C-alpha cells in the first residue's frame, strides 16, 4: 500500500512555529526535526502509512524543538532561529500542498503574545508523561 501525507495544520508565533499532524490512533510515530526540515511518519488506526517531509520557510533551532503525541494528533513546536520574524508560510517553496492548512483556531496577531506562547510550550512540557 502506498503511503500518503497526513493532514497538517500550522500556525506562527514570535518564537515558535506550531504544526499539528492530524492522525487518530497513531502507531510507529517518528518525528525528526532538523534545522531546515521536519520528517514525520506513522501509521493511522487503519494501518495506513502516513509520511510528510517539509522543508521549512527558514532555519529553526532543532535542539530546542519538541513534539507531543495525543490520541488524535502529533503536535510539534519548532523554535525559530530568528525570533519575532513572521513566517508567511511554513514551506520553503511558495506552494500550498492540499494536505497543509493554516490553523485559524490558533492563529492570532502577535501583539502581547509572548505570555500565550510561553503558556502553550509549558503546557506541552508539563504534559510529557504520556509520550
Swiss-Prot record:
Task: State the Gene3D superfamilies in the record.
Answer: 2.60.40.790
- Domain CS spans what residues? 3-91
- Could you state a single Gene Ontology molecular function term? Hsp90 protein binding
InterPro entries per UniProt: CS_dom, HSP20-like_chaperone, p23-like
So which domain of life are we looking at? Eukaryota
Q: Which SUPFAM superfamilies match?
A: HSP20-like chaperones
Q: Tell me which family the UniProt entry assigns to this protein.
A: Belongs to the p23/wos2 family.
Q: What is this protein called?
A: Putative protein PTGES3L
Source organism: Mus musculus
Which gene specifies this protein's sequence?
Answer: Ptges3l
